[in-house]
Regions:
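Well-ordered secondary-structure scaffolds
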Residues: 53-60, 67-70, 74-244
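Active-site cofactor/substrate anionic-group-binding motifs, chiefly glycine-
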Residues: 1
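Phosphate/pyrophosphate-binding betaalpha-module
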Residues: 5-71
């Protein structure tokens, strides 16, 4: 959410009624947690924090699934990260969490699937809120990095299949890919930005977007790191990059 809020004026803090109206009108909304939506979750998290159970898989499951189920959804796709840059450091723990969330969610009548995706290395080329928004816009215009585009198509394809909006995953993923290249995904994103207080005019040109995000700034500095020897970059530690 903090990435989206790097867009000037954009707010994820909207009321439940406004949230529901926006979904009815344009088909999507991205909002922060509300005190009147699963209010027990915040209290439970406070208890987890002081009892050393933040990493408890059953409690993580209840926290995540309760918010999704409270929205009254019929289908859900979960992107469960694992690796150095993720909360779950190994694929075994991520798989255990995935199975727990899928089981509970399906038991509540929500058609749910989970994808395990690695966060050992950064996804895409950018790190940082504004830079990642810029890269997301490039992806919505069909010009994004291949790994990010693939993840978007996999998650979107599974959701279309799960919701019955496509006959199978392949058709769903193809439709998502088409939306990235025909401009419809970007257009829908602009609708959401405008509905949640952001300035859609920022996205009219690359220069206006760079200025709006504070990236086109003379105070920005860059440094060059010279390799000590000739070779290939074999690995990039996502957590080390995040901590810079």
């Amino acid at each position: 959410l903090d990435k989206l809020e790097s867009i000037p004026g954009f707010s994820t803090d909207i009321g439940i009624e406004e949230f529901m109206n926006q979904v009815d009108e344009i088909g999507l909304a991205i909002v922060s947690q509300k005190k009147d939506l699963v209010p027990a979750d915040k209290r439970l998290y406070s208890l987890r924090d002081v009892t050393g159970t933040v990493a408890s898989i059953p409690l993580i499951t209840s926290s995540i699934v309760s918010k999704k189920a409270a929205e009254g959804i019929s289908s859900l796709v979960l992107d469960v990260k694992f690796g150095r840059g993720a909360f779950m450091k190994d694929i075994g723990s991520a798989r255990e969490l995935s199975e727990s969330m899928v089981g509970v969610s399906n038991g509540l009548g929500v058609s749910t699937v989970a994808v395990l995706s690695s966060m050992d290395r950064p996804i895409g080329y950018s790190v940082g809120n504004s830079l990642e928004i810029l890269e997301s816009v490039e992806t919505l215009l069909g010009r994004g990095p291949a790994d990010l585009e693939e993840l978007v198509c996999v998650l979107g394809g599974l959701l279309l299949e799960s919701s019955g909006s496509s006959n199978d995953f392949e058709e769903g993923a193809a439709r998502i890919l088409d939306s990235l290249y025909d401009g419809s995904a970007f257009g829908k994103f602009i609708e959401m930005v405008a509905s949640q207080g952001g300035d859609p005019d920022l996205f009219e040109s690359e220069v206006s977007l760079l200025e709006g995000l504070g990236i086109l700034d003379q105070t920005l500095k860059s440094d060059s790191l010279e390799a000590k020897q000739i070779g290939w970059i074999a690995d990039i530690d996502a957590m080390a990059i995040a901590e810079i």
